[in-house]
Amino acid sequence: LNTYERKYLTLLEALEIINRKKEETQREFPVFYAAGYTPLHLLSFTQAYLQTSIPHERVIIKSGLFNDLIGNISMSKREEYRHLLIHIEWPDLDPRLGLRSSSGWDLSMLTDVIETIEKKTHALIAEVESAAASVPITLCFPTLPIFPMSYQPPYLLQSLRTKMDGLMHRVQQRFIDSSRVQMIDPYWLDLHYTGYDRYDAESEISFGFPFTLPFASFLGALFADTIRVPAPKKGL
């Protein structure tokens, strides 16, 4: 279905789909969702979209602990899953990049932030490599805006952001030829949602869930699509 013509689910519609399936006893389709934020409604949207595409199995999505992305990826290896969804956001690489921890920001911390992100990126790559040996993976890169961390005007390119993007590019280069890891294209997201149309600060502060519902529905549909459509074999 053409993305521009696609009708996206409301939260109520997603919950109705999930609840209908709970009444049926069918073979399970287990998925693990690794993220550092509280996934809440994004889990519901992903589960509902995936459920509609595989009606003969009951989709179950489990998630891990708050604020421990890398630990959650490792946790996924304790059980067997049909698919592993990994969603990185900047606070997963350094909590100081998140709204909840940004009150103590000082520009003198920039060097330390970069070093922390670099170490976490290396650890992330290692965990993804390990997990991919046993389960197919969908990897989504940071989708939310970061707050200005420079005295420069916000429309000018910042050194920190350039280095952060470079580290994510390193992850992309590592897995771009992998038949086990699919990666959501950040530019595809940009075509449909601006950074600030994705973010709900009030929800993040109250519940640890940082997304607007329309964007969560859009992202859940993408996640479901990557699971039900196998990655093409490399070189073909």
Task: Mark where each language-model region is.
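Extracellular glycan-modifying ectodomains
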Residues: L1-L236
